[in-house]
C-alpha cells in the first residue's frame, strides 16, 4: 500500500539542463566557503539543516548557528529540512519521522522551505510516505541525473567527496549538458582538509566553473520544483 501512496511521479521536460548544489548538516564551511563560491557566479545553494545539530562539532566539522542560517537565507540561499534530530529515516516509525520533520520546521519558522533530504540517505517506502505528508520534495543519495519520469520523494543526486575525486562529477555535468535533466550535487563540509563526506574548495570551485562553462542553469531545489510543477 505504501508503495502505491508514494509513487506520484513528475515528467521532466527533456530540454531541461539544470544543476542544484546541495549541502547536508550545515557545517560552517559549506556556507562560508562553498556559499561564497556560488555567490561569485550569482548562484545559490540548498542547505538541508537539522536544528538539533546547531553549533555542535560533528565529523563534518563545526555546525553553524541559527544566526548564520538566517543570514544566508536573507542572501537568497534555500534553507531546507533534514529533520530536527538528524534521525535515520529508515529505522523509525513514519509518525515519528513526520513529527521530527515538523519540529524542525517549527524551529526554523519563516525561513525553511518545503524541501527535504533523508539523513544518512536512508529511505524506504515508509520514509517516502512520511516525507510526502509534509514536504514537496525529498532528496536521497541514489546516484544519477533526474530525467524522464521522476519520483519527487526520492530525487537522485551525485556526491562531491574528496576521497572519490571529482571526475565522475565532471562527467555528470557533461552528460547533463548533452542529454538534459536535473543534476543535483550534494556534499557536507568544504575545506582544505575535508571529512570523508566533504570536498576541498578547489574541487568545488572547479566543479562550479565547469557548470558555468557548459551554460547550465543553476537553481535551488525549491526553485526547480516550482518550475517543473507549474
Language model features with spans:
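A short, charged/proline- and glycine-enriched loop
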Residues: 13-19
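Generic enzyme active-site microenvironment
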Residues: 20-23, 80, 186-187, 218
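Amphipathic, non-transmembrane alpha-helical secondary structure
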Residues: 31-40, 66, 70, 74, ...
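Short N-terminal helix/helix-N-cap motif within the alpha/beta-hydrolase-1
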Residues: 31-32, 125-126, 195
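Active-site glycine- and acidic-residue-rich loops that bind
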Residues: 58-60, 160-167, 198
